[in-house]
Amino acid sequence: MLGIEFPLFAFSHCRDVVAAVSRAGGFGVFGAVAHTPDNIHEELDWIDAHTDGKPYGIDVLVPENLATRGEGSITARSLEARIPEAHRLFAASLLADAGVTPRSVEESFGDRPQPFDPENALLVLEAAFKHPIKLIANALGVPPREMIEMGKAHGVPVAALAGAREHAVRLAEAGVDIIVAQGGEAGGHCGEVSTLVLVPEIIKAVAPIRNVPVLAAGGIITGEQMAACMALGAAGAWTGSVWLATVESETSPVFREKMIAASSRDAVRVCSRTGKPARQLRSAWTEAWEHRPDSPGALPMPFMSLISEEALRAATVAAERGNAKARDLVTYFVGQGVGLIDDVRGAVQVVQDFKQGYIDAIERMTALIAE
């Protein structure tokens, strides 16, 4: 369907990772949630020039359930006025205690659309179709009908992530071309069912509806894990966290250091970044919002991002300048597979390691059968 050499999908917000993986025989998927129809062209122009004609895709995020659903023309600025004072003060106190000074919402977002804005996502896709993209993907629910129709009109497959069997059934019935069975080990927004259980459960559930390829996602860091998922019936592996520790990644050196030092138990599923359950690295930020008795609790999506994104950006900048308390606050989306990451590699090397690990696993299993 996609014309790739090795069914390793690399989701990344970094264009360098996307291009490197596609050139190496995998399939890079560019995360475009933070982009607009105007600035997406710069990113995709660069990818077009650096993939040697190899295929890549784009991922957007159109939540089915959004606190502002049905409201029109919402900007980050207009949302900011609706944030409760208790949440403002709590976030401000965390930053002040760490000696961190954030920018205002006005400086951070200006007149940009609200975070996770559905209308903006569809406009980004329209702009993306001016480039040779070979896949569009969506998370947090069934893609809107307009997105599925766009894909069909351009001959581009539509993928969507599912964290539960019932979600996958709805995706198959809606007409998506590829389902990503994302286990609870995954970084970012995820469900509660493990990858080992979810992959065969979804394959079994959608088979009577129609033939839909299912990719495995959630905690996959090695080629051996990829082989195991494909033994379960997956058509490939959708990965994310492993690329955060690459040389090319958009993550800061401080975060990469924290990743390498972390165990799988340090990847916690909390709401303190986006307002929806999302797995990220445990930090003073996540611990305060989740466990301090004076915490007002997370706001629903999209409000929470207006508090968290600038706060955590400012904390990262301060941490890079040597602020130890700010370093304690630093976090980012990452899955439980972080416990398997112990060094920083180039993206091409990661692809090669996946291939070798996959081959080694298949050879071991074949040898067991032969015995």
PLM region spans:
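Active-site entrance/lid segments in N-terminal catalytic domains of soluble metabolic enzymes
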Residues: 1-193, 197-209
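Conserved active-site-proximal phosphate/metal-binding subdomains
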Residues: 74-90, 192-215, 221-371
